[in-house]
């Protein structure tokens, strides 16, 4: 199946330039869809906002997506992309729609398939194809989202593989002809995607053609994760795609040099689908179809293109003009690329026939470097990184990393170190050699490197079957491989055996596995000479001659080896060892040895070895004399005074002799943290005031960083590293600055915050770093920041600009709210809007009209500096704002052409569609123990059994489900340590009473009256104690009810005697005092730990108490017998909704709960003015017993319900709108 499609498409590509379609998001945006459009009927009651979930439209608006497909096909597109850019389970998690990923991918492929087939039927001479799209996800596998923890990852390779596998299967099942891995900004994500795709192909028994398309993100010409175009290509070349290309981020002008480079280096067809130019000052794409076609025609005439299409800002008209531009132009002819081993880190490394000897740094090996082993054992990873950095600075073109030591967790150490290496551009620019005798360590390492690395090593020692299995996986991971000359019989120690084993391995790898011969690197075993054992004397000669044999008989294979092994007999005399290495390598290189694992800082030059010593060494290495060993031993003593070896190359630390100002600047530019505190302190002592250090050398260094970044000479990982150094320096100076009450100068003070309800801040952090590098003072409030805090800090700190960020769709409404509050409170600051779900359209239509001062949509970090400069310049601001407002007016005019389609229902209609319960046939259970029950100083040992540990790990940003998180390759060990620490605290809490758990519950006679619930003082039901006010879902529902909590309590008129429960529990009595003690001691870890444990105890208490209520106190489920896992999954009868959460979102309803139970007086829990509970580790809510009761979400409500709710609560409309704001439609 796959081979036929590939042959068909390749035949087409050789004849003409094929057309890919254009921007799907651009076209969807043109429809001006509203929330209800995204929801459709099926998701009308979904608990979170869905607007912006474009992939969901294949289910809710399939006719619209098909209409877009037809438009592109009519314009001339040969290849349709499925509407699945964000359809992986990982990306769909933003909407809690992971379970729909497979269905969405299938439906999207099916829609595209139907459209393509219709057009193929119209003109069989122009067949149309479907490319199943796999987007990059919203996470990065090779970049930490936390600038303070470069080793942390928020997604693993295995999680990506699982997500991409599910999407791939569905895309194929839906009818895709090709798989398109596109908009790659993190190559490791793409490698995981390719791994998943190839695994699915193997599973299905056929392969489809694969297209790969990456994204160059800035002027440096690199991906977001730091790779050059060629390095990126080398990293994914193993996939053998039908096409390799670039898309998004840049317009044709900016993208041209990278397309040209790709066309030069790629053995396969080249594709590109650029944006319609760069976004202008207002965030829109200006390049017209005609202008874009001119660029495309020039590319075609220059011989760059095999496939062309469009990305952001492009439309069917752009594709139509592109089609006309390339008509009659010859497609790019595939070039003859010389066979070579093409490796990569952030930069490419090509090893060809004419390449000089490649040095592989050996010092990052715990078995070969005592210093490195000590640093890893003591977890001094910053210093261990220095070892790697020194190797690269001293000339290592590859670094070998080995963690095999009995007292180390080799797998965890390998993962941690490789993740940290990825954050150090000076190290990660070179390819990585993952070195281990344990396959699981090798595999864990391969899952951490975005470049094309080398595995060291595999062999035939355990037989052919194991050898083939490992080789296939290495190829799928995209690595080259070192093969040891070792089989079931043993290691090859003679020239003949070396060639025999290597030949056997080569034939298996190349002929059977399909491994590229240029990616096979043989290690024919370097053994020690001059050992005093005659049988060892010819070891070096055997190796040197075997090198020539292998190069002659095994085409394109390479040769490597551990060079230091040859001199092992002279350990302790480094000078002589280096002489042996120099002589040995000289003869090996002459015979064709390609690379060697060496100490890059201690390589001697053959001609620099003293003649007398060199001759004696040569006698040993070439086995020219029977007494060669004895003669070398004698001569070696003459060099004993040099036995310490050459001193460490002083040039690496030459900068330490510079002035302190220059040292600080150098440290910032290079991202060196080792000396930053001592240098900052020296600069402080030299300055008349501490602020001068920031405004002088530190800012000078950051200005250099900003300039280099702006010029494309420095890229994002380096900038982030520089920011880390700056933070450490400023942290040291802050106490002195505060003591002297100094105020510094900057280009402006900018407040950044991820809005309430959103935890995503990668983009915000990058913007902050870039602005800091351009001398803006940044106040970063972090994530989940409420409006009131943003505005309070903005006033207190007298900031010049406020910047809001958000990734998930509910953040858009929160941004509107912030703008309204800024207007209401009389702010006059510019407001910046950014984040993945934000858009110019939303900014213009929903946000800008609510605020009288500039609101600017900033779609990337590089644009932020120009925008801020314009906004804070008296000269530039008027013209900038005038253009901005004119542009937004145009956007609004376009938006208003389409009338919003909404499907609300009246409150009367919603009430008529309440939950249908036959109350006459149902007898509500009376409680066994009515009234209020208090649990003071409750037994912590009991609560421990009910803890749900998964959220505990999330508190520490460790993603994974308990207890399987302990097996997680990246976070498992850390999770175990946290778990142990938490349980140690729980032991202390039990034994010493450090925290108190208090709780209470009550069961009260109740009846529903419309949407509200009356709670009575006693069983006579004559006096109402409290009325609980509820909201009802108010969206049209062809199927299902419009839910309200009152539906689950017997109506007053039914005469049935029903009940309701209330509860409040806390695990945090004394929590604040304990945490404050630790903070005062500088122990943030235990401060956070005690709060996290208290939070888990509160949730466990809520779970325990609900179970006890069901089984004993109310007793309606006396026979219930559920495990803790089943309790966590809510497999029981009844619900316990909490005020402030989806089923009852209005927070003031906690008030009646507090009063019914007399909570504050009884157990000390209180409510703040905004109805937040105190202590923070607290839970409260209601108990409903009806077997049909279920959780649901109240989304948007209409004005009639707002008025009804206000009247029932005794509020005026203004008060109602304040508390119901998030749920009010419009």
Swiss-Prot record:
Residue numbers binding methylcob(III)alamin: 695, 757-761, 805, 809, 861
Domain Pterin-binding: 357-618
Residues that bind Zn(2+): 248, 311-312
Keyword S-adenosyl-L-methionine included in the entry's annotation: yes
Domain Hcy-binding residue range list: 6-326
Co-factor note (free text): Binds 1 zinc ion per subunit.
Domains as described in the record: Modular enzyme with four functionally distinct domains. The isolated Hcy-binding domain catalyzes methyl transfer from free methylcobalamin to homocysteine. The Hcy-binding domain in association with the pterin-binding domain catalyzes the methylation of cob(I)alamin by methyltetrahydrofolate and the methylation of homocysteine. The B12-binding domain binds the cofactor. The AdoMet activation domain binds S-adenosyl-L-methionine. Under aerobic conditions cob(I)alamin can be converted to inactive cob(II)alamin.
Miscellaneous: L-homocysteine is bound via the zinc atom.
Name of this chain's protein: Methionine synthase
Organism name: Vibrio vulnificus (strain YJ016)
Gene that this sequence comes from: metH
